[in-house]
Amino acid sequence: MSTTTETVTWSQYKPQETQRRLSRSSTITPSVSEYRSGFSKTAFGNIELEEIPDKQGNITRATSNLESNSYPKALDPDACPPKRSIALVLLNNLMSEMSLTIALPISAAYTEILGGTDAFSGLVIGIPTMISLVCLYPMLRFANPKSANGYTLYFRPLIVSCISQIIGHLLYSLAYRAQWLYLILIGRMCSGVGFTMFLYHKTYLTDKNFVGQNRSTFLATLNILAQILGSMAGAFLGGILAKASMHLTDPIWNQYTAGSWFMLFIWIVYSIFLSIFFKEVRVGNTATNVRKPESFTGKTAPLSFKQKFMLCFLSMAAFISIFNVAGYQTSVPIYAKALYHYNPFQSGNFLSLSSLVIAPFVFFSTFLSKWLEDRQIMLYGFMMGIVALIVHLVLDAVHKIPVQPYFVLYSIMQFGFSVGSAPLVSLATKQLHPKYHMITGVVVQVGISIGETVGSICGGAIFDITTVGFIAMNLGIALLVFIQLLYLWTFIKTKTG
């Protein structure tokens, strides 16, 4: 039996204002008992919907127009979603990154034993994000049904990511037993459906409907920190499980499949916790007479030429950042094996140690948003990445690149481009009307998906391209986006926070 409950939510909250402002809105002051019972079950599933009043305890149904480039006036600048929902989204990001990178140390050896090449290994690493790009539109339709009044139901892509990751890891693990090379690729493609969640990690943590302006950059950088920790944990577990299972002859659990089986079990446990603890923050209710926010009525000014150019720039910045990081990550086992005679375990340690080193710096960079603008964070991050690429290019060209300088340069490059790409969505949400928030997320995710796939393929073929050519290519496209950043410098000025 379904129960209809009145849900008054984020976009309708408004602090007490003057009589002139109140004349255009109706105010409801709930009792304590009403607020305590402010969780409801709806037709969207058995997911709790949280309702939180403003600091004065009032819930206001605002019907005034939103400014095209500012946060909704009804939203507290320090507002954020329920903390346990934030934790589950960040954990999903971390585990998704683990699923993406746990194959890095052993991928080349796994594909080789089944008859594949290094380039095919790069394709195995990079294909999931391309599949996520293909599945992006169906997922957008699924997460934004008509009954949601234009808002996003984040639980839907979350649970889809769990199911697809479980199936993907299962197929990847069974490829050795089947002795079929392409089952590895099919398994990774199934996992790619779950990687559509990379879009929703960004949009959830910067959603202007329930994330205040003072929180968006901070949460966006926490999202990058989760990715860094996921890269560290995935590469480390992939290497150590491969080493621990090196002498096993079991066709099911061995050095090539142990990491994938491990992630399969972790995803099963996570999906159970997700179903129990995730709380959907809903910003509208069809059962009430609340007027739909103007941000979704289509009565907003179209994007200007500079705003469109900015979106193209953000997509390209995302592409280049991830292209560099993914390309280098994929090339490390191949590059280190040729130069330093590294095995998969040592390559996994190399990747995980680098992530471990930069993780504290990424964490401290989350507080930079209090003093630095988004554009300044991007500038400093890209500058660090470019300098690391220049030094690596010179050392590689003269064939004087010991493992220690290589490790330092790789870590600086990864840190620079990771931090530089952190505020992309946050910057756009501060510049554009809330109506364009999801479009911004999609544009950035397109750049990330293409960069991940192309970068991984190029990294896997590093010796076919030549090492100097690979590094020079990374440097050239990084300089291109750096020039675009300088061109847009005055246009993308935003407040700190």
From Swiss-Prot:
Keywords for this protein: Membrane, Phosphoprotein, Transmembrane, Transmembrane helix
Superkingdom as given in the UniProt entry: Eukaryota
Organismal lineage: Eukaryota, Fungi, Dikarya, Ascomycota, Taphrinomycotina
Primary location class: membrane
Protein name per Swiss-Prot or TrEMBL: Uncharacterized protein CC613.01
Location(s) in or outside the cell: Membrane
InterPro entries: MFS, MFS_Domain-Containing_Protein, MFS_trans_sf
Keyword Phosphoprotein set for record: yes
Organism per entry: Schizosaccharomyces pombe (strain 972 / ATCC 24843)
Gene3D superfamilies linked: MFS general substrate transporter like domains (1.20.1250.20)
Pfam families linked: MFS_1
Biased composition (Polar residues): 1-16
Coiled coil: none
Region described as Disordered: 1-29
